[in-house]
Regions:
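Active-site acidic/histidine proton-transfer and metal-coordination neighborhood
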Residues: 1-84, 169
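Conserved, mostly hydrophobic/aromatic
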Residues: 5, 52, 70, 88, ...
Length: 188
């Protein structure tokens, strides 16, 4: 994958943890395994001139839920030159994180959650829609804080909901969502 990414002109690879649909505890073995994996992948990324974007998944069943845990592992292996974290607004809210790491963030993913019947602990990828006025995840505030902290990288959409994929005019919907986010950020 690293060979293909480098050949395509990509600057990095997003790395997501296991999401096994079962609770993964915070054992010393799990922490050691994360560090071992990051060390091994670091040499592969380095050989291809790529960065590693570590994306904790905020689901309760994820083997890596928190950016803080990812950054501790990155620091423990001396990997800050290769690794940054992905700030995903959906997973940030789902994990119940309050701290953002703008200077350690290499990529931002945004998506909205509008259905008031879905709790943050129960939300799934299938609930992720484009960001709009009914957003419950606080996308605009998260972006505002990231920018205020110095983040100046890429922001990309990650709406996985079927209703988004089935839109008659997806380009228009994406443009409307971009417009909403821009206008909301300008109102700061």
């Amino acid at each position: 994958m690293a060979t293909i990414a480098a050949a395509s002109g990509a600057t990095g690879l997003v790395m997501c943890p296991l999401n096994e649909n079962k609770f993964v505890d915070d054992s010393p073995e799990k922490a050691a395994g994360l560090r071992t994996a990051l060390k091994a992948i670091r040499s592969i990324l380095g050989a291809h001139g790529l960065k590693g974007f570590v994306e904790p998944l905020g689901f309760p069943v994820s083997s890596l839920r928190l950016k803080q845990e990812a950054l501790a592992a990155i620091d423990d292996i001396g990997g800050a030159d290769v690794y940054t974290v992905v700030h995903d607004t959906f997973h940030h809210r789902g994990a119940g994180e309050s701290r953002l790491y703008p200077s350690r963030t290499g990529l931002v993913h945004i998506s909205g959650l509008e259905d008031p019947a879905i709790s943050f602990m129960d939300m799934l990828d299938s609930h992720r829609v484009l960001v709009g006025s009914k957003d419950r995840l606080g996308n605009v505030e998260q972006l505002r804080q990231l920018y205020a902290g110095g983040y100046d990288g890429i922001v990309s959409f990650e709406p996985f909901a079927k209703e988004v994929h089935d839109l008659a005019d997806p380009i228009g919907a994406v443009r409307a969502s971009i417009g909403f986010v821009r206008e909301a950020l300008e109102r700061a």
